[in-house]
């Protein structure tokens, strides 16, 4: 998992994935397969992407009783994803069970997929946290607590807003991964996410990986948008024209 850019393949079919990836032929990407695509195409979509040379984040956000999550992770470990995730709200025992399942299911000679925990969705704000979820603690405090719990449970990192990456690193250590969705170019619409930042700011705030979806997948020129992503991540202010 070398590139810090995770491209969210939020498509309903393999055909649309192939169409989007065509301009990137020969360029290994780090891609995210979420519920929409995985539930339509199943494990075969991960196998296809791996055959094309891409790293895969299988974003299914497991949240169930510990034994169910353990058995599910045993199966997912054989699918071939490089990164998987759970909801930290499932608690310590569930997260520990996820690691147990991955350890048990990873084929001999293959590295165990890294496992990260979702702290709070980037569509969650303070009002929703308090009024709908009935969590009385401030959002930042809740995220920090979930991150610490994930680390104590043996996970490799968390999914969090870039705005939360710095204090998570401070609390959990520099090697604890901060994978941040809610990334938009400055001239993009935020859509249904409320805690959004630009690629440049995400790096400055301490993100290890950034998840980028509609800014790339709905771009008129995805290759050019990817080049812009690289350029902005590296501190540039003007759009580049070709990816490196």
Swiss-Prot record:
Entry EC no(s): 4.1.1.23
Residues where substrate binds: 10, 32, 59-68, 122, 184, 193, 213-214
GO biological process: 'de novo' pyrimidine nucleobase biosynthetic process; 'de novo' UMP biosynthetic process
HAMAP family: OMPdecase_type1_B
Subunit record text: Homodimer.
Function summary: Catalyzes the decarboxylation of orotidine 5'-monophosphate (OMP) to uridine 5'-monophosphate (UMP).
Protein name: Orotidine 5'-phosphate decarboxylase
Gene: pyrF
